[in-house]
C-alpha cells in the first residue's frame, strides 16, 4: 500500500479555520484547537443572533408605534385591532417608519382608524 502525504490537505483545513478566526484575540487566533472551538462557538452565536434580530426589531417597531399612538391618545393594541377591522394592510415596520419619519401621514392613518 502506498503512503499518502496529507500536508496540503491538512494545511488547507487549518487555513480555512484560521481565516474564519481572523480578528479573534490571543490564542483564539493562533492555536488551531482553540481557534476551531471559538469559530464553532462564533458560528453558533451568529446563527442564534440572526433569529434574535427578527424578534428585537419587531419589539422596537411595536415600541415606536405605541409611543406615537399614545401621543394621539390611543394605545397600541386598540390601534392594531382597528387597523385589522378597517382592512388597512400596513405592517409594523411600515407603521414604525411612518411614526418616526413622517408623523403627518401616521396621524392621517390614526384618524382614519379612529373614525
Curated annotation (Swiss-Prot):
Keyword Ribonucleoprotein (UniProt): yes
Keywords, in A-Z order: Chloroplast, Plastid, Ribonucleoprotein, Ribosomal protein, RNA-binding, rRNA-binding
One CC-aspect GO term: chloroplast
Cited Pfam families: Ribosomal_L20
Subcellular location: Plastid, Chloroplast
Disulphide-bonded residues: none
GO molecular function: rRNA binding; structural constituent of ribosome
GO BP field: ribosomal large subunit assembly; translation
This protein's record includes keyword RNA-binding: yes
CDD domains named in the record: Ribosomal_L20 (cd07026)
Family membership: Belongs to the bacterial ribosomal protein bL20 family.
Stated role: Binds directly to 23S ribosomal RNA and is necessary for the in vitro assembly process of the 50S ribosomal subunit. It is not involved in the protein synthesizing functions of that subunit.
Stored PANTHER family: 39S RIBOSOMAL PROTEIN L20
Name of protein: Large ribosomal subunit protein bL20c
Species the sequence originates in: Pyropia yezoensis (Susabi-nori)
High-level lineage: Eukaryota, Rhodophyta, Bangiophyceae, Bangiales, Bangiaceae
Encoding gene (name): rpl20
